[in-house]
């Protein structure tokens, strides 16, 4: 699936430097950024924090061709670097790279795992582990996929899917060489490991349940004679009343 195109609106940044960027973030709720590449001079820009945060809610923003409108001019870019605030849900700085239709670009694209809930390994009690969540690819802008699907529906217990198993779209290649010695696993299925703490907790829970059942049985036995005595007394009283 080809990546969608999103449009972001930015303004040229007149003042640069840490102090100017700090004031901009604090008083104007704007994010400083830079646009570079394609043989053109870098541009210092600003974007509204709220618009940028909304765009970043979509996973596609990170692996798509973006349209960046600066003033009255539009340019095709990709999101190249993002710096987040360490305690607040805010963006501190962002970098965009211009692209050319004739030049290949390098991007990290997310992996979407399919069929894992119904694979034989899971049905046998195994658990799927995602060892990689994205891969780095090289392709022309027109061939950039939004994500790459990984079919796990065939996985048996103790089996893995490797980079060499990926079905890449036409025109898309991995940046890393893949051979017998360099073929990283991206997902696997194994039986869940039970830790010592889990075993001890399960044993303690079973002991408590057994103790509770024993106490309930003892209480039942204690109440039973009293109930029988009451029933016997009622019967004797009934016989006495009958004779009278």
From Swiss-Prot:
Signal peptide: none
Keywords in alphabetical order: Ribonucleoprotein, Ribosomal protein, RNA-binding, rRNA-binding
Annotated Gene Ontology cellular component terms: cytosolic large ribosomal subunit
Region Disordered, annotated ranges: 197-244
Residue ranges with Low complexity bias: 204-215
GO molecular function: 5S rRNA binding; structural constituent of ribosome
Gene3D superfamilies reported for this sequence: Ribosomal protein L25, beta domain, Ribosomal Protein L25, Chain P
GO-annotated biological processes: translation
Biological role: This is one of the proteins that binds to the 5S RNA in the ribosome where it forms part of the central protuberance.
Family: Belongs to the bacterial ribosomal protein bL25 family. CTC subfamily.
Assembly, per entry: Part of the 50S ribosomal subunit; part of the 5S rRNA/L5/L18/L25 subcomplex. Contacts the 5S rRNA. Binds to the 5S rRNA independently of L5 and L18.
PANTHER family the record matches: RIBOSOMAL PROTEIN L25/GLN-TRNA SYNTHETASE, ANTI-CODON-BINDING DOMAIN-CONTAINING PROTEIN, RIBOSOMAL PROTEIN L25_GLN-TRNA SYNTHETASE, ANTI-CODON-BINDING DOMAIN-CONTAINING PROTEIN
Protein's UniProt name: Large ribosomal subunit protein bL25
Species this protein is from: Coxiella burnetii (strain RSA 493 / Nine Mile phase I)
